C-alpha cells in the first residue's frame, strides 16, 4: 500500500469527475485520520503509458468513498492498493468484425482507455460505444468527453433512461426491442459481435441474460466466448 497525490480534478458530467493521480496502478481508497482505509475498485481511464493515473468517479450521495474522492483538491493524497485487477481484456474474445462497448455512468472509464489507444481494439473494423445514464445532460456530456479522448474511429450512441434523447430507455430494454441494433446499423450475433460491458450490476445481469439467448456468452473453462464484463460494485 502506498500514497499517491491528486494532480487535477474536473467535472466531465453531472457528479462525474475525472481524477488524475500520480502513478502507479491499483485500487484507490481514502483513509480518514483514525479510521481504517475504505477501498473501492475503480477502472483506470487512461493508457498504461500515461504519466498519470486517471479515474472516473461518480459522487454518490451517502457513499463511503466517492464523495470524499470527488471533494479532493490538487495536492491531496490517497492510499493506493498496489494490486491491479481487471476482466476487460479484448484479446480474450477474438473474432468478429464489430466490438460493442456498453457502459453506464462512470463505467465509461475502461473504454476511455481503450479508445484512446490506437492498438487495443485494432482487431475489429467497427467500434461502437453505447453510454447509458439517467439524464440527457449526463449522457451528452459523457459522450462529448469520450469523443474528445478517442484516437480511433468510433460510433458513439447515448441512451437516457429518464428523458428523451438520441435513444430513450435503459440499454437492456433497447437491446430487447431491437432499437439499439437499428440505430447502430449492426447486429448482436456470435459471428460478428464482441461485447465489453462495464456498469451497474442490474445492467450487467440483464444484458448478459439477453445475450445468452443469442448465444453470446463469456469465455469459460477453455471454451471461447464473445462477451466480457466488469461490474462497478
Label the predicted regions.
Residues 104-109:
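Ser/Thr-glycine-rich phosphate-binding loops at phosphate-binding pockets of nucleotides
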Residues 99-102, 196:
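Conserved beta-strand elements of the Class I
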Residues 1-74:
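Ferredoxin-reductase
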Residues 92-98, 189-191:
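Short helix-loop-beta connector
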Residues 84-94:
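A short, basic/flexible loop-to-alpha-helix module at the beginning of a structural domain
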Residues 130-233:
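Reductase modules of NAD(P)H-dependent flavoproteins
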Residues 96, 119-127:
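Conserved S-adenosyl-L-methionine
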Residues 110-120:
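Histidine-anchored nucleotide/phosphate-binding helix
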